[in-house]
Amino acid sequence: VFLFAISAIEVIIGILEMKRYFHEELEAVRSHLMEMGERAVESANLALRALEQRDLDIADSVIEGDDMIDAIETRIDEEVARYISLRAPVAKDLRLLFVAVKASHDLERVGDEATSIAKRTKKMLSSNETYRGLGRVPDMCELAISMLKEALLSFIQEEEDIAHQIIGRDKAVDALNRENFKEFVELMKDDPSKVDVYAEMIFISKSFERIADHAKNISEEVYFLLTSQSLKQVIKEETKS
């Protein structure tokens, strides 16, 4: 009986240790996703600063920082694969892993868009061409980054209402992008020698629009994590009523 009791205690201790290990693994995934989000936000901010200040060094720092964002995405993918292979996750944990993978891919794309902006900024600066104004690009960047920050906040605080509020704001970013397109086309007409420069500005504007799209995607993913519901479907039903 004594030996049986010891064996039972050892089994219980083993189970508790395993649960603690799995909990730490999940927290590592969550932590790395937040680190990736912070780096993606910083990258987008720096990309705008490089453009506004015509600063090659800042642009270079954005480009160099993209490798770290990519590395964290790879690490999250590996952690999720390892967790699933070690145990069959319960529904809630499985949703977290699913969202972590999808959100990390969106954040990786945010880093790519910021890098694209930095490279286009360098291209404009290296041509020694001057550009007159940035249109509504700074406003777009501010709105896109606020959406991204709030999407991450909804994940940290587990607040589906925050995720819900983000949807629809991407339409404001889309509208700003259309304004930019019209303005930059007019600037091309006014000064045909600057066609290449303002073509780059059109692409930069489009990159910030895409960053907002990725923020919207993350908010939808977080909403699904917290409610098991499709945010698109919820909003569609709300629109009908």
Where are these regions (language model features)?
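N-terminal amphipathic/basic-hydrophobic helices that include classical n-h-c signal peptides
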Residues: 1-17
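Cytosolic, long alpha-helical scaffolding segments
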Residues: 14-241
